[in-house]
């Protein structure tokens, strides 16, 4: 009975969080209302970023989903374990039913260290990341990567 009550409370809080996030990010945030987010999940849309979430996405504690000028698209039925982070400056596309182990970091960018400037002024190199359907990733995911279906 306690689990059922906890699930209902979490569902209501997730729904409210999605509504509030949508209000403050009208153009940059699109989500199905059927999600299961931990109370500590952070969603951030900066600059011209966009986050597109399909339904039935489940997150554990301390997950961060961030679009910093890029597009973060997450397919149906995805699972993010504790401490996962996805940050898009260009584009990250995650297929349906993808699962991520604890502390997986997904970035589509890296510091541009080829520049003669200091690391703080050098900017970023970006490349799209595509993760297919039915994929399980258990550790850090490097930018410029492409992972096909059922990997």
Regions of interest found by a model, annotated:
Residues 147:
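Extracellular carbohydrate recognition
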Residues 115-117:
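A short acidic, helix-capping loop that chelates divalent metal ions and anchors anionic groups
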Residues 110-111:
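Extracellular/periplasm-exposed beta-strand and loop segments of Gram-negative cell-envelope proteins
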Residues 1-107, 128-134, 140-143, 151:
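Domain-scale signature associated with acetyltransferase and cell-envelope carbohydrate enzymes
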Residues 119-129:
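A short acidic, glycine-rich active-site loop
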